[in-house]
Amino acid sequence: MKTSESTDRFGGVAGETTNRTVLLLAHTGRPAALRSARLVHESLTRAGVTVRMLASEIEAIRKTGARMQPVEVVEPGADAAAGTELIMVLGGDGTLLRAAELARPAGAPLLGVNLGHVGFLAEAERDDLSDTVRCVVERDYSVEERMTIDVAVYNGGRTSAAPAVRTWALNEATAEKVESGRMLEVVLEIDGRPLSRWGCDGVVCATPTGSTAHAFSGGGPIVWPSVEALLVVPLSAHALFARPLVVAPDAVIALEVLPETTDGVLWCDGRRRVELPAGARVEISRSKTPVRLARLQQAPFTNRLVAKFALPVAGWRGRAAERDSG
């Protein structure tokens, strides 16, 4: 526990609040998130930290009849998090992925408080809210970087000089079929060489962070965040060779939607949609711009898996020292 005069992990003084700004985001569809946002806002303001919020979220809180203390109002966009030291997110993984769109351009770390279901990206739970606010005020947290991927869509396949769309993803980019009664026909390419053709429901291209999301539901492996790799997971592929693949982190993955197939659609983190007409080409590669996550504790990733997925570990004995340390 730090005192008000202790040095924080960023070289400042814990409790020092001069010119400090935190962007606060909440899931406006959850009453609990709106109540928590109001309490967090009041606590940070009392501590001398400027709170910035989106205009739409302030309006959602006011519609509940709650009165708001002074707050810095911004609109969503690339500059929403500019100049902030942290983005505090109240909600589930979907809310955190929305917040990542604001955090990535500014390089601001995300600190998630889970008010959803699994909340795999969140660092704290609802019952930890008061202590989480204290950690923010005292700068009692560390920051880790998570790999993201750049995504380029060429509507003319290899003949396109420039991509029709450029976007990115923290978890995954997923090419999916549009028509329920027809398969999407694609060819997978790794580093400029064709690997396999699949008739499938779709293909997930994921980061290690995304290995516990859509890729996991499709039968892909869980990859520790410290492992540098990219994943390719075919969904319900009608092929003998249709296994999840783990490829080098600097590999260039390409999916070509065959001209004779139905149109598809590309989803990035389940939020950004891009149409994939027949003949389109999707190229996916490691991005130079990571997303930063704030961590309150240095618990092993194994512990997070056990807690979030409620994995059965009863009967484990291990070494005596390991049992004693929990």
UniProtKB/Swiss-Prot annotation:
Any one GO molecular-function label of the UniProt entry: NAD+ kinase activity
Active site: D93 (proton acceptor)
Cell compartments where the protein resides: Cytoplasm
EC number annotated for this UniProt entry: 2.7.1.23
GO biological process: NAD metabolic process; NADP biosynthetic process
InterPro entries: ATP-NAD_kinase_N, ATP-NAD_kinase_PpnK-typ_C, NAD/diacylglycerol_kinase_sf, NADK
Positions contributing to NAD(+) binding: D93, G94, R98, N171, E172, R182, D201, T212, A213, H214, A215, F216, S217
Reaction(s) the record says it catalyses: NAD(+) + ATP = ADP + NADP(+) + H(+)
GO annotations of cellular component type: cytoplasm
Cofactors that this protein relies on: a divalent metal cation
Alphabetic keyword roster: ATP-binding, Cytoplasm, Kinase, NAD, NADP, Nucleotide-binding, Transferase
Family designation: Belongs to the NAD kinase family.
Function (record text): Involved in the regulation of the intracellular balance of NAD and NADP, and is a key enzyme in the biosynthesis of NADP. Catalyzes specifically the phosphorylation on 2'-hydroxyl of the adenosine moiety of NAD to yield NADP.
Listed name of the protein: NAD kinase
Source species of the chain: Thermobifida fusca (strain YX)
Organism classification: Bacteria, Bacillati, Actinomycetota, Actinomycetes, Streptosporangiales
Gene that encodes it: nadK
